[in-house]
Amino acid sequence: MAIKTYKPYTPSRRYITGLSSEDITAKPSVRSLLVKLPAHAGRNSYGRITSRHKEAGAKKLYRIIDFKRRKFGIEGKVEAIEYDPYRNCRIALIAYKDGEKRYILQPRGLSVGDIVAAAESGLDIKPGNAMKLKNIPVGTIVHNVELKPGKGGQMIRSAGAYAQLMGKEEKYVILRLASGEMRQVLAECMASIGEVGNEEWANVTIGKAGRNRHRGIRPQTRGSAMNPVDHPHGGGEGKKNSGRHPVTPWGKPTKGAKTRRKKASDKLIISRRKGK
């Protein structure tokens, strides 16, 4: 997939880059798989901001994606590759032999006309197929990995993401994530074969503020530009610094300090991600 550049008809277009849409099939989406989601814009049920710098963005319809991949024993044919406004990878429309249609994440190398399937075991190791982790050979690249059997894929779903199956231990398998983290996952969990497509997404330059506004991202104001009542870095004359180590608006250390709480799943992490 190629990166597009634009002629600088306006100053803001000079540095914009985008992705070519040559891989997208020119046909409408399946209406039964579209649903309108309410725009929360970072607010909770009381209307209070719980996630800053968010807004509704451009109007869009959510595509219902099959993250579980538990339609066993029935082959499906890729009918279309489509754009999904809710994610940075493409999605593939699968038409199964029993007449049902579902969307899945498009792995790298999957194209219109290919045949995919899901089963507990016994499938070819090719992009788009899905099996239980215990039956996937060691060394295989996987994506859309479940954390709890039957719950649906929760890890490794964004454009260009992947994990490698490194080994098997009793009821667990060991995955190496792209970050370098080594993690145990239950062997009964499902995973899809291959790397998530649209890997060039990481090289796209947003280029102008309006493009982020369309995506639902509001501007971020520096704490040093605020008043002392609004941020620990606020106040002072001119561009005077705050005189303290960088912190969040609530006083937690930022810029490298670890603030993640311990979770029960920490015991499944064999080695932490490597710093980049």
Curated annotation (Swiss-Prot):
Sequence segments annotated as region (Disordered): 210-276
Keywords for this protein: Ribonucleoprotein, Ribosomal protein, RNA-binding, rRNA-binding
SMART domains named among the record's database cross-references: Ribosomal_L2, Ribosomal_L2_C
BP GO terms, sorted: cytoplasmic translation
Biased segments, Basic and acidic residues type: 230-240
Keyword check for Thylakoid: no
Pfam families: Ribosomal_L2 (PF00181), Ribosomal_L2_C (PF03947)
Database matches in InterPro entries: NA-bd_OB-fold, Rib_uL2_dom2, Ribosomal_uL2, Ribosomal_uL2_bac/org-type, Ribosomal_uL2_C, Ribosomal_uL2_CS, Ribosomal_uL2_dom3, Ribosomal_uL2_RNA-bd_dom
Molecular-function annotations in GO: rRNA binding; structural constituent of ribosome; transferase activity
Cellular component per GO, a single term: large ribosomal subunit
Biased amino acid composition, Basic residues: 255-276
Function: One of the primary rRNA binding proteins. Required for association of the 30S and 50S subunits to form the 70S ribosome, for tRNA binding and peptide bond formation. It has been suggested to have peptidyltransferase activity; this is somewhat controversial. Makes several contacts with the 16S rRNA in the 70S ribosome.
HAMAP family, per the entry: Ribosomal_uL2_B
NCBIfam families in alphabetical order: rplB_bact
Family: Belongs to the universal ribosomal protein uL2 family.
Subunit structure: Part of the 50S ribosomal subunit. Forms a bridge to the 30S subunit in the 70S ribosome.
Protein name (record): Large ribosomal subunit protein uL2
